[in-house]
Structure formats: C-alpha cells, structure tokens
Design a protein with these regions (language model features):
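Alpha-helical, largely C-terminal catalytic domains
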Residues: 1-192
C-alpha cells in the first residue's frame, strides 16, 4: 500500500473520533464513536479467558470496525434509527470497503458479513458487548441526560444478545444491578 493510500484510510477513520454518540461521559461531554469502539475492544480483550476457543483477533477487529459506517452518517440512537438509516449506513460503509486495497477490502468485507449474519460466537460476542458498552456508558454518565424511554431501555438493551452464553448473561445482570443503583439514586434525589 502506498503512503498516500495508507493516509487516506487513516484520515477517513479519524471521523470516528469526531462523531459523537447519544451517551454523555462522566466529564460532561458526549462520547465519540471511536471511544465506544475502543472500549468494546478492551472489554473483549479482558474476556479472552472466558472464551478460549474464539478468534480474538477477529473479535477485536469487529469491535474496532463495527460502527465504521457512522463516519459517513453519524451516530443515530438505536431508538431513532430506521431501516432506511441502516441501509444508507451499510451502503456508504460498503463503498468505503470497496475503495480499500484488495487484501484489506476482502478481510473487512468478511468481518462485516460475519457480523451481519450473527452466526459465529465472535459476532455474537461483539454484538452483546456493543449493546452492553452503551448501557455502561449511560450508567457512568449523568442520568439527568437520559430521555424518559431510556429508563426501561437501560434494563433491556442487549439482554437478549448477551443471553447466548452464561458469561455474558451474568455480566449483563451485573450491569443491570448498576442500572438499578443509578435509578435508585435518582429516586432518592426526587424524595429530598
């Protein structure tokens, strides 16, 4: 790959740092798509002993790349995203993949096909962590930024995706305990 082609990729993926997500960080600013993907990758890494038979490299690459389409569309919260939004994001993502140098295009296309099919343990882990990371970030941020529909969403988002394995099911249950603590804290504020 030429330095020019390499830098074109690097400049494009920089957009993940610029695109903000719906969640607010503890510092009072919105999380970026890059931060979300980065933490997902680390979450996967620290679960490696729980999943000794999975291809960790594929999981890490999926985690880092899974929201690449949002470079072009921005992040649309799950409760607002339509089928048309998803189709447009996939179309733009696929155009980006097609422009990658051949060996990378094939590998990245394969990763997205695997994630879209949701048949492998690797893809299921990534989907569960994607949902779980969003809930954890909401728990860590200011709950006063939550929309009314998010109180229920915090308890249910990603529960189904985590249920395929006891490890992630148990982890998601612990995340729900944190959700309950955050909501209980808000309820105490209202009582004062």
């Amino acid at each position: 790959m030429s330095p020019k082609d390499y830098l074109a990729i690097v400049h494009c993926i920089a957009g993940l740092k610029e695109r903000t997500r719906h969640a607010w960080m503890t510092s009072g600013r919105q999380e970026s798509v890059a931060e979300h993907s980065w933490r997902m990758a680390l979450m996967a890494y620290f679960l490696r002993d729980e999943f000794p038979t999975v291809d960790l490299t594929r999981v890490l690459l999926m985690a880092l790349l899974h929201d690449m389409g949002e470079v072009f569309t921005g992040d649309i919260p799950t409760f607002e995203k339509t089928d048309a939004d998803r189709a447009r994001e996939h179309e733009l993502r696929d155009e980006w993949i097609d422009a990658l140098p051949a060996p990378y295009a094939a590998e990245v296309r394969s990763l997205f096909a695997e994630m879209d099919a949701m048949e492998t343990e690797e893809a299921k882990i990534v989907k569960a962590l994607d949902r779980m990371e969003a809930v954890i970030t909401h728990n860590e941020g200011d709950p006063h930024t939550w929309l009314p529909l998010e109180y229920d969403l915090q308890r249910t988002y990603g529960v189904k995706e985590a249920a395929f394995t006891p490890v992630l099911k148990e982890l998601r249950a612990e995340v729900n305990r944190e959700v309950d603590e955050v909501i209980a804290g808000l309820n105490k504020e209202t009582e004062l």
